[in-house]
UniProtKB/Swiss-Prot annotation:
This is DNA replication and repair protein RecF. It comes from the Bacteria. The lineage of its organism: Bacteria, Pseudomonadati, Spirochaetota, Spirochaetia, Leptospirales. One of its GO terms (biological process) is DNA replication. HAMAP family: RecF. GO terms for cellular component: cytoplasm. The gene is recF. The RecF protein is involved in DNA metabolism; it is required for DNA replication and normal SOS inducibility. RecF binds preferentially to single-stranded, linear DNA. It also seems to bind ATP. InterPro entries: DNA-binding_RecF, DNA-binding_RecF_CS, P-loop_NTPase, RecF/RecN/SMC_N, RecF_2. GO terms for molecular function: ATP binding; single-stranded DNA binding. Pfam families: SMC_N. ATP binds at residues 30-37. It is found in: Cytoplasm.
Length: 365
């Protein structure tokens, strides 16, 4: 995939901006706070239909405005397509999605139209944030290419919310929960099986990636840890934990309690891992998603690299450059282009460099 054009209106710090991209490697260069990451965020919005930094659409609107608009022209499989995302906060909250000028009603209809892989310092949350962040990582990855999975996940969360609301009322008749239990199990088992499949597939790329990054020194396993192993155990645990759930006022078992273990000798990486090991692990994970898109799904995603190269040591930088060499289009943000020139200089492709200062963008090369 290749992003050829990007338009922003009233998005974050940008009132109006239109950029054309004709190179494989694009650099946004500027000091912190100048709006570099806002551009990657806009690209992510076209891909994920949500921000990687902000949960509320209204907070993405430029100060003093009531709406934002994004448009991207994407080339893939010899065809060009146009994605549009718009959001209005006043007088009524409304979001509008378009694909090739036609309005799209369901978010799931846009899945797979524009795929990106983002690498950012915030990725360390996957390692340090515990089970919730690791589930979020796996769910976001699967949802990026599997609309049925996303629909199951959204439905599961709705059912879980209904069941928890009933539990909080302190109902005495378990039959009132039975319909929600059946639905929870039905959707939960579908999610469980897909997570198992994808984690197994990612592992085949994650382990070699980690070996390259660490020189074979870090033997850190990635193991899917389901809260329930199958449908029968889900049924049994829900029944056995009913009393506990009534006391707690929420559902204590299910796929919403799953974990993705990363560590060694049954010890999680958060208990012993150095910052270098954590960085290697998260890069190996993110690179594994890129490998999966490319080798399993036969899709070349666009790489978005948010000021992470300078944080890496020599060996990790060399691996990073190898990843970019084997990628398609890649967007970088950096405060210091000269500081990473020794590494990106090895990339012989034509580059586009945009200098960002006080909200203004100047094409430098």
């Amino acid at each position: 995939m290749f992003l050829k054009h990007l338009t922003l209106q009233n998005f974050r710090s940008y009132e109006e901006l239109s950029l054309d991209f004709n190179s494989r490697l694009i650099f946004f260069v500027g000091d912190n706070g100048e709006g570099k990451t806002n551009l990657l965020e806009a690209i992510c919005m076209l891909s994920w239909l949500k921000s990687f930094r902000e949960s509320e659409d209204s907070n993405l609107i430029r100060w003093g405005s009531e709406n934002y608009f994004l448009r991207g022209k994407i080339k893939g499989d010899q065809k060009e397509s146009v994605l549009e995302v718009g959001f209005t906060a006043k007088p009524t909250v409304k979001r509008k999605l378009k694909f090739n000028q036609e309005e799209v009603k369901k978010r799931t209809d846009l899945i797979g139209k524009f795929i990106t892989v983002l690498l950012t310092p915030m990725d360390l949350k996957i390692i340090e944030g515990g089970p919730a962040e690791r589930r979020k990582f796996i769910d976001a990855f699967i949802s990026s290419f599997d609309p049925f999975y996303l629909e199951c996940l959204l439905e599961y969360n709705k059912i879980l919310k209904h069941r928890n609301a009933l539990l909080k009322t302190g109902i005495s008749d378990a039959s009132h929960l039975s319909i929600w239990d059946r639905k929870l199990i039905e959707k939960g088992v579908l999610i469980l099986n897909k997570r198992k499949e994808i984690v197994f597939g990612l592992n085949s790329f994650y382990q070699p990636n980690l070996n390259k990054l660490s020189g074979g020194k870090d033997e850190l396993e990635m193991i899917y840890g389901p809260n329930v192993k199958d449908k029968d155990e889900f049924v049994e645990k829900l029944g056995r934990n009913l009393g506990k759930d009534l006391r707690l006022g929420y559902t204590s078992v299910g796929i919403h309690r799953d974990d993705l273990f990363i560590g060694a000798d049954k010890r999680d990486i958060t208990e012993f891992g150095s910052q270098g090991q954590k960085r290697s692990t998260v890069i190996a994970l993110k690179a594994a998603t890129f490998n999966y898109y490319r080798n399993v799904l036969d899709t070349m995603p666009v790489l978005l690299i948010d000021d992470v190269i300078r944080e890496l040591d020599v060996k990790r930088r060399e691996y990073f450059v190898d990843l970019v060499i084997n990628a398609g289009q890649a967007f970088f943000t950096t405060t210091d282009l000269e500081g990473i020139q020794d590494y990106v200089g090895k990339l012989k492709d034509q580059k586009q460099i945009f200098l960002i200062q006080q909200g203004n963008i100047q094409f430098a090369k």
